[in-house]
Amino acid sequence: MDPVKEVCVESFDEAIRAVEAGASRIELCENLAVGGTTPSYGTIRKCLEKLPVPFMVMIRPRGGNFIYSRDEFEIMQEDILQCKELGVYGVVCSFSQQKILSLTGNVQLLDLSKYQILFKVKDGYFTKILTTGN
C-alpha cells in the first residue's frame, strides 16, 4: 500500500494544484498564517464537487490559542455538523490539553488527561487522531 500524501492547503485552487502534484489526501483550511481556520462553506462544496481525492476540513473559528469559549465550541459543532451533512471525509480539530469538545447532545467541556483523548460522535468514535508527536 502506498503511503498517504496529505497536503495542507488554504484554497480550492491550491487543492487542485496539490492533487495534480500527487497529493492523495487534502487538509483544507484557510488563513494558514494564523495556523489555519475553517474554510468557507462554498469552498468546501466546490472541493466536494471537483476533487478526486478525500479531504479533511479544519474546524477552527479563529487563529490564536486553542482555548475556546462556549460560543466558539457551538460554532465549531455547527461547522462539524455541516461537514457531516455535506459528506466530507473528515474534520481536523485542535484543542488545549484540558478542554475537549463533546459532540454528543449539547456542547460540553470535558476534563481529560493529555493522553486519554477519545472523541465520541452520535454514531461512533473518530477513527484517527493526529498529534504533533510530543
Predicted regions and their residues:
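Hydrophobic faces of well-ordered beta-strands that scaffold small-molecule active sites
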Residues: 3-7, 26-28, 55-59, 91-93, ...
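N-terminal pre-domain/capping segments
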Residues: 2-24, 31, 38
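Alpha-helix-loop-beta-strand connector modules within alpha/beta enzyme cores
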Residues: 36-63, 102-124
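Alpha-helix N-cap and loop-to-helix initiation/capping positions
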Residues: 35-43, 68-78, 100-101
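Active-site beta-loop-alpha junctions enriched in small/polar residues
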Residues: 10-12, 31, 58-64, 94-98, ...
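Glycine-rich phosphate-binding active-site loops on the catalytic face of alpha/beta enzymes
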Residues: 24-37, 81-99, 134
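Catalytic cores of alpha/beta
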Residues: 10-21, 67-80, 125-134
